[in-house]
């Protein structure tokens, strides 16, 4: 079962992560986001409601 031999797969994995962290990550992080996030503190007003089967009615007692 050759897939249990970690020698070739570990080398591929480690070289891929090495390339990603050293070469690609600074290039990706150098781009500026087009839409900067704003610090809006808008509270979302949600109206709560009850489920029909949780309402207590006097006809079912």
Swiss-Prot record:
One of its GO terms (molecular function) is proton transmembrane transporter activity. Keywords: ATP synthesis, CF(0), Hydrogen ion transport, Ion transport, Membrane, Mitochondrion, Transmembrane, Transmembrane helix, Transport. It comes from the Eukaryota. It is a single-pass membrane protein. One of its GO terms (cellular component) is mitochondrial membrane. Its main location: mitochondrion. It is found in: Mitochondrion membrane. The chain crosses the membrane at residues 10-32. One of its GO terms (biological process) is proton motive force-driven ATP synthesis. Subunit 8, of the mitochondrial membrane ATP synthase complex (F(1)F(0) ATP synthase or Complex V) that produces ATP from ADP in the presence of a proton gradient across the membrane which is generated by electron transport complexes of the respiratory chain. ATP synthase complex consist of a soluble F(1) head domain - the catalytic core - and a membrane F(1) domain - the membrane proton channel. These two domains are linked by a central stalk rotating inside the F(1) region and a stationary peripheral stalk. Belongs to the ATPase protein 8 family. Component of the ATP synthase complex composed at least of ATP5F1A/subunit alpha, ATP5F1B/subunit beta, ATP5MC1/subunit c (homooctomer), MT-ATP6/subunit a, MT-ATP8/subunit 8, ATP5ME/subunit e, ATP5MF/subunit f, ATP5MG/subunit g, ATP5MK/subunit k, ATP5MJ/subunit j, ATP5F1C/subunit gamma, ATP5F1D/subunit delta, ATP5F1E/subunit epsilon, ATP5PF/subunit F6, ATP5PB/subunit b, ATP5PD/subunit d, ATP5PO/subunit OSCP. This is ATP synthase F(0) complex subunit 8. It comes from Chelonia mydas (Green sea-turtle).
């Amino acid at each position: 079962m050759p897939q249990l031999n970690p020698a070739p797969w570990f080398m591929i994995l480690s070289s891929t992560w090495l390339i990603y962290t050293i070469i690609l990550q600074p290039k990706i992080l150098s781009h500026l986001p087009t839409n900067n996030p704003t610090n809006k503190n808008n509270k979302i007003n949600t109206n709560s409601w009850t489920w029909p089967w949780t309402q207590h009615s006097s006809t079912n007692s």
